[in-house]
Every structure is written in structure tokens, then in C-alpha cells.
């Protein structure tokens, strides 16, 4: 299902009709949300998903301004039939990402943990960008989850580098030592660290609102089990 995000999350009559068909219930359903070019990041994705529990996945796409310029099929065909508009395919565009997903050729990046290794993750992202390799989905654990989350949000090396620089400097402050607590499960309470993570991401964003499909892994210390967040 393809929808413009600006139209609101209400379930349409067509969706209700399809939901009543027995054959439709056996088909994998995915949501593609279209966002205007220049949108900083999606918002309110959770509202769309709550109204459609039958969805298997969702994808966010930025659409070029020209897609909203032409309202008739004839004008769209005329634009694409013009040789001047037939340039090389941009493999980094959101529509190329969708095409790879539909063809089972998505490129995923998973970043590991290790504290200071986060700086190395930044260097690897730079190398991937310089090599012209698109990143379609991301995941990670510990510092890798932080770095992959930033990339899924911004998808821009300069912006991610700036956010990382601020966070690295934040974590080097001596005020970190004020976060000491009784060492039952940890030497630090985690409040200072959690606050620094929240500063790096917009307050109103959820995992569902990230541009790229994202997951991260944590450990539930109460049950010693793995938790996957996506």
C-alpha cells in the first residue's frame, strides 16, 4: 500500500474492502509512506501502524518535487519521454532502495559494540560512502546501535560526524563521575549516559520514524535474555 504521509493515517474504504477478502488475508502487506523532499524525518508512523496491525513492514520514501508537480498521467509520461530527463539511475535514491528491497537485493549494515570503536564505525561509514555503496537497512548493538541509529536518521556523513563529535566530547566530561551509584549491577546509574543519548536524537522521534529500517539489540539484565528493538 502506497500513501502520502501528509494525508493522515485514517484507514481508507479500499483498505477496509480488501481486508474483508479472504485471499487478501493470506498476502503479505507492506506500507510505503511518501514524504515531501526536504522533510527532516518522518513523524507519526506509529499512528499508521496502530490502525493497520496486519502490516508486515513499512518503508519511508522521499519523493522529488517533480512527482507532485504533474497531476495527470499524460504529463508524467511526457516528462519521462523527454530525452533530457533520462539521466543515469541514482542508486542512492529512496526509490532505488525500494527497488532493491522488492528484488531481494537490499544492502544491510550491522555495527558491533565496543565503546571507543564507535569512532572506527564513523570511518567505515565514510569509506562506504566514498566507495559509492548504498545502505538500505541498518542495525547494531551498544555503540553500534547508536551509530546505526544516527545514520538511519540523517543518512548524511557530515551531519552524523557532527552529532558524534558532540556526543564524544559530552562523554569525556568529568561530570560523568557524578553518576556513580551502589555497584549492585553497575558502577554508574546510567542517567547521565541515557541523557546524552536522548540529546543526540529528536525528542519526538521513534524507531518507526527513522528513514531506514533499523533494529538494535540489548540485554535484559533481569532475565538475562536478548531483546531486539525494531
Regions found by a protein language model. Name each.
Residues 1-61:
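Conserved catalytic-core segment of NTP-binding enzymes
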Residues 200-207:
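Phosphate/pyrophosphate-binding loops at sites that engage ATP/ADP/AMP, CoA/4′-phosphopantetheine
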Residues 30-32, 108, 215-217:
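A structural signal for isolated positions on well-ordered beta-strands in alpha/beta enzyme cores
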Residues 208-230:
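Active-site gating loop/helix substructures
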Residues 61-63, 229:
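Generic detection of short hydrophobic beta-strand segments and adjacent strand-loop junctions
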Residues 64-105:
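Extreme N-terminal, non-catalytic leader segments
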Residues 108-110, 117-200, 228-230:
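Patatin-like phospholipase
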